[in-house]
């Protein structure tokens, strides 16, 4: 009898352990990492002027044969697989983190260089939108929920809808009119490191920009309800654009890019992600 009870207790304990383990592991994850870029990489979709150089640099906007950036140029790159960012059945939302390094070089002083680059999430199979100050992800400056697009922009030109401070970081929700901005000082031609994190539980989107060359650090954060902004499945990408006037141009070079997202399959699932208040760069 004692042996039977012991077996029953062990069986029950094992069942509970498996249930807990299943709950911990009930998380849908996706991740990718490019420490450099390779021409012909099937995991990336290049749009517009975007190309990958033989030296492993992702150029979002065109460089002329004389080595100078071209005006009126727009380019984007998308991760080739869609990301499940929230689930309609369970109501769960993914936490995510992306990191990338880039540089912007402005060889011209007149007219003012333009326009910037942006990390964005939006509907799958989308095509580049208007360039210039719309950065390839919007077609006008109106607030329009049909865009279903979220972006973190690094804007170098003050358009009529922008704050007077440029350059600035902006959080864009269904509009190029940022819901929050933070000025930063462009370190011309120097590499910047970016970390963008979204914590689904607090709904806080947080971005950090660091210039290792100068030690300058810039941060921005805002509450964003991803489920009210984005479709269930999204493309994630980087987009850049130059200005509409001759020589209103700059380079938008990306050297590395990583992304990870964790979507719990139930509201009780444990998400094994890093501390979203920690920003190691």
From Swiss-Prot:
How is this chain modified after translation?
A minor C-terminal proteolytic processing site is observed at position 268.
Provide the residue ranges of the propeptide in this protein: 269-281
Keyword vocabulary terms for this entry: Calcium, Glycoprotein, Lectin, Signal
A matching Pfam family: Lectin_legB
Q: Which InterPro entries match?
A: ConA-like_dom_sf, L-lectin, Lectin_LegA_CS, Lectin_legB_Mn/Ca_BS, Legume_lectin_dom, Leguminous_Lectin
Q: Which CDD domains match?
A: lectin_legume_LecRK_Arcelin_ConA
Signal peptide range:
1-26
User: Where on the tree of life does the source sit, at the highest rank?
Assistant: Eukaryota
Q: Which residues are glycosylated?
A: 43, 139
Q: State a single Gene Ontology molecular function.
A: carbohydrate binding
> Does the record carry Ion transport as a key word?
no
Keyword Ribosomal protein applies:
no
Question: Which family does the UniProt entry place this protein in?
Answer: Belongs to the leguminous lectin family.
Quaternary state and partners of this protein? Homodimer.
Anything else of interest in the record?
Binds one manganese (or another transition metal) ion and one calcium ion.
Q: What does this protein do?
A: Galactose and N-acetyllactosamine specific lectin.
Protein name, as recorded: Lectin
């Amino acid at each position: 009898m004692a042996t039977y009870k012991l077996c029953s207790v062990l069986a029950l304990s094992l069942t509970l352990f498996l249930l807990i383990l299943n709950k911990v592991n009930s998380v849908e994850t996706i991740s990718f990492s490019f420490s450099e870029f390779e021409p012909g990489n099937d995991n990336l979709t290049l749009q517009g002027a975007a190309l990958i150089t033989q030296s492993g640099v992702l150029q979002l906007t065109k460089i002329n044969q004389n080595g100078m950036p071209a005006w009126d140029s727009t380019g984007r790159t998308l991760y080739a697989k869609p990301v499940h960012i929230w689930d309609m059945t369970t109501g769960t939302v993914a936490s995510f983190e992306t990191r990338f390094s880039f540089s912007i070089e402005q060889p011209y002083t007149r007219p003012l260089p333009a326009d910037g680059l942006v990390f964005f999430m939006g509907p799958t199979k989308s095509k580049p939108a208007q360039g210039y100050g719309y950065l390839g992800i919007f077609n006008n400056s109106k607030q329009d929920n049909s865009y279903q697009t979220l972006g973190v922009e690094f804007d170098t030109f003050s358009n009529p809808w922008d704050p007077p401070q440029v350059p600035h970081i902006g959080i864009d929700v269904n509009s190029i009119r940022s819901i929050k901005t933070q000025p930063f000082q462009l370190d011309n031609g120097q590499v910047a490191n970016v970390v963008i994190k979204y914590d689904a539980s607090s709904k806080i989107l947080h971005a950090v920009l660091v210039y290792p060359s100068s030690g300058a650090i810039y941060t921005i954060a805002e509450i964003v309800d991803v489920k009210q902004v984005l479709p269930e499945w999204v493309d994630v990408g980087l987009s850049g654009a130059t200005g509409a006037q001759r020589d209103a141009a700059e380079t938008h070079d990306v050297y590395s890019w990583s992304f990870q997202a964790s979507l719990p399959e139930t509201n009780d699932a444990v998400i094994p992600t890093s501390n979203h208040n920690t920003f190691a760069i």
